[in-house]
Regions:
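Short, well-structured N-terminal submotif of metal-dependent ribonuclease cores
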Residues: 1-43, 54-71
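A generic structural signal for short hydrophobic patches within well-formed alpha-helices
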Residues: 12, 48-51, 86, 139
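Alpha-helix termini
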Residues: 32-37, 96-101, 120-129, 147
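Acidic, metal-associated active-site segment
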Residues: 51, 107-129
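Acidic catalytic patch
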Residues: 75-101
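Short acidic-hydrophobic, aromatic-tinged amphipathic segments that line or gate anion-handling sites
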Residues: 76-81, 147-153
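Short loop/helix-cap segments at secondary-structure boundaries that form the rim of catalytic
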Residues: 138-144
Length: 153
């Protein structure tokens, strides 16, 4: 079954890393297998922003170029942030706090909640969408999220 793999900043950061260390090789091979299996890889706007701002701050222009190229290589890979997703994120954020399960400090933007909302408002059925991450803890209270290395292509 093909799925939509929504990338979190950890895996996306590895994919844009210029050095070929063991983690970069592993995720690059994983991505190739996923694409060959028919999965669609999605880069949500909030994660693009989160990663790009840090790469710019650190002066990593080569990684910025890799990120931009990867995001634009396939039509439909970049998922813009919609009003619908922002509305849903506000509702998820409030509900998590009301239930005593916040995912970030009250003053933080809370990228995880916005990412979850982007995944939930995606065009496909929720069962076809999984967030590929390095830490599924906070995300999994809202949406299907798995460590990228545990997602079978």
């Amino acid at each position: 079954m093909s799925r939509f793999l929504v990338l979190d900043s950890g895996p996306l950061g590895l994919l844009t890393h210029p050095q070929r260390n063991a983690d970069v090789v592993a995720i690059t091979e994983w991505l190739s297998r996923c694409l060959l299996s028919g999965h669609r890889v999605i880069i949500p706007a909030i994660i693009y922003y989160e990663l790009k701002r840090e790469l710019l701050r650190a002066g990593k222009s080569f990684s910025v170029a890799r990120l931009e190229a990867f995001a634009s290589r396939t039509p439909g890979r970049y998922l813009p942030l919609s009003d619908e997703a922002l509305q849903l994120a506000a509702e998820l954020w409030a509900k998590a706090r009301q239930q005593g399960r916040p995912t970030a400090d009250a003053k933080d933007l809370d990228v995880d909640v916005i990412l979850a909302a982007q995944a939930l408002s995606f065009e496909s059925a929720p069962s076809d969408v999984v967030i590929a991450t390095s830490n599924a803890k906070h995300l999994s209270q809202f949406v299907t999220a798995q460590n990228w290395s545990e997602i079978l292509p």
